[in-house]
Amino acid sequence: MTPTVNAKTVTRNVGWSVLSKTGTFGLKFVTVPILARILSPEEFGAVAVALTVVQFLAMIGGAGLTSALVIQQHEEMETVHSVFWANLAIALMMALGLFVFAEPLATLLGAPEAAYLLRIMSLLIPLQLGGDVAYSLLVRRMNFRKDAVWSMISESLGAVIAVLLALLGFGIWSLLAQLFVSALVRLSGLYAVSRYAPRFVFSLQRVLALSRFSFGMMGSEIANFITFQSPMVVISRYLGLSDAGAYSAANRFASIPNQVVLSAVMGVLFPTFGQMMHDRERRSQALMLSTQVTTVLLAPMMFGLWALAEPAMLVLFGSQWAYAWPVLGLLALSKGILTPCSTFIPYLKGVGQGAVLFWWALIRAVATTGAVAYGAIDGSLVEAMIWLCIVNAVTLVGYSWVVFRADSTPFLKGLFISSRPMIAALLMALVVRFLLEHFGAHVPNAVLQLIAGTAIGSVIYTVLILLTERSLLRRLLDMARARKPRAAPAGAAE
């Protein structure tokens, strides 16, 4: 039975999800720079290209069926078992197809030397899809604590093994080991905590009934995947594996704040918005509050990383990657521009706006791929990233219009309120960048530049938020006070 959604359950589950992603953040904050210092850009690029294909096929294989399970009114085990077997059959076919056609696919992506990686990594597809049903059951039950624990365990073991193998000289195999260890541990953990045991029960009719919703979700997820992963494919094909490796390393690090906040919040918001589907007022309030809070948290991290990209790249990745600091900065900037859109995907999914989500995701995918390709074909990696920033700025306006129109919220009002923390973060970053460029020479140590810039930026941003977001802060304070247990009346125990 799906639990009742209220502020307490949402806050608790967001807390567990954030804890899980924070653990992952800490690991990647340490392991990505270590691996980058040991491995070459070409090795990073080869694995990143192969992983893009695997993730794409795994996403198609799921066909959105498990997302449909999440919003079903009742947990019918015949339907659950049917989805499991459908997922497994599709996963095995996908893995076999990737194994057979690895060479032409790798050549198409501009990385023919990565064909053997595609064959090995094809085994990841059934490992990933095999746990989707167990995970969807935890999401339905709003039980994110158990998932959080196993996420941290799987990521920790994978990261530790990757670093150890890299230090022992295993090179690219250390990255493969990280992927397989994390996938196997997470798969085992999901089945252990969900207590789901597949049975030989299958109903094609039930699978087809779910597909009416799932195909719309799958289409939008494919388009979103293309949006996020097409830059890697374009860069690999037109600029080579070295630039693809630089992009991959920078993108891994720049994506850490998103993974901490967005992955955690989005997983909880999807079922939450789903249960508020027919309550327009609560749904609208939840949309605006969650959007403001995620923007307040994410925007300073993204714009701050843009401002301090040069010393950050040198300190974290070492001198062999120092040339790629503009890529890190522009990637952080491109992600910072989209921070007000952080809650839009789970909102549209949760309220059943699958068609709207699909068409907008498709438009965004085409625009992003075209912009990055335009910058890469006749330019450089930096030019491609500049065009990514431009298309994301246009996306911010368009996406906001789509969502606020679906929510019946005035567009300009919604855009202003949701983007206000982002503007404050941008102003903070401009000041920090100005100080670094004009006074950075007086602090020759990159570590000290990073510390000083972070401290100055934190003070500036805090002041700006206190000045511009007082109503939001008061509301959060009132919510925190309301969650405190009230004292029992004097005669309650008599």
Swiss-Prot record:
Membrane spanning stretches: 16-36, 44-64, 82-102, 105-125, 157-177, 215-235, 253-273, 297-317, 321-341, 343-363, 384-404, 421-441, 447-467
Location in or out of the cell: Cell membrane
Parts forming coiled coils: none
Protein keywords: Cell membrane, Exopolysaccharide synthesis, Membrane, Plasmid, Transmembrane, Transmembrane helix
Pathways involved: Glycan metabolism; exopolysaccharide biosynthesis
Swiss-Prot/TrEMBL GO biological process terms: polysaccharide biosynthetic process
Name of the molecule in the record: Succinoglycan biosynthesis transport protein ExoT
Source organism of the structure: Rhizobium meliloti (strain 1021)
Lineage: Bacteria, Pseudomonadati, Pseudomonadota, Alphaproteobacteria, Hyphomicrobiales
Gene from which this protein is expressed: exoT
